[in-house]
Amino acid sequence: SGANVARNTGIELATGDIVAFLDDDDIWDADYLEQHLIAHQQADAVLSGFRYLGDPTNTCINPIETISQNVIKKGNKFCGMSGASCKTEIAKRLKFDVELKNSQDWDFFVRLTLENVKFVNIPKDIYNYRRGHVSISTEVKNMPISKVYPRLLPFKKHREFLGHRAYGDRVSEQVLSFIGNKSNKLKWIYVCYSEAGFVATWNALVIRRVIPKLLRIKKRNTM
């Protein structure tokens, strides 16, 4: 069971030249498939932007049009699988990793770039993405430490691809996300140190969190 099993079943049954993916709670625009087909005239795989369902002014549109290995190393800043399509022959060869519980889309996109396919992005919001009932911040805040280890598997799988610095950045951001809302902060910091190393932990905690927060406080106090 699970999304990746369902996607793989769809890929196995696909008979057309291109396969597109749609989660059951998201909604494509009327011309979504048309725009992807146009992009596929010059590409093997295509992504596109989205807007949040019920909040049409809140969009996620990445201006980058060519998706390279260096771009995807920084994470999936494009869309989920509801914004993705791919040539069927490539999808049948790659399939989705059913062992992963998160970052399945990023894992698939990484493997597309490793295939050196022509991978492009449509910098428009052409589908509606539905948020879950439980916010990500609430879910992460209440997550026990034991639950974070499975979330690191995609990064460990692609550790060589990421390289030392990007690997540390991805792991530290996953472990320390919403650290201000978590209990047992020292335990979370220790897990980050154990998994990502001192430098990555320092950068994520101090450089990207503590210092910007102090600067914002200083700015407010001087206004």
Language-model-detected regions and their locations in the chain:
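Short aromatic/hydrophobic "clamp" motif used to bind/position activated sugar donors
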Residues: 19
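Conserved nucleotide-sugar donor-binding catalytic segment
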Residues: 66-146
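Membrane-interface aromatic/basic loop that binds lipid-linked glycans or pyrophosphate carriers
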Residues: 178-223
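Flexible acidic/His/Gly-enriched loops in nucleotide-sugar-dependent glycosyltransferase catalytic domains
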Residues: 5, 33-90, 139-141, 165-166
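Catalytic core of nucleotide-sugar-dependent glycosyltransferases
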Residues: 125-132, 138-166, 186-194
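Glycine-rich, basic loop-to-helix element that forms the pyrophosphate-binding segment
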Residues: 1-14
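Acidic donor-diphosphate engagement hotspot in glycosyltransferases and nucleotidyltransferases
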Residues: 7, 28-33, 104, 108
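The conserved acidic donor/metal-binding loop of glycosyltransferases
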Residues: 23-27
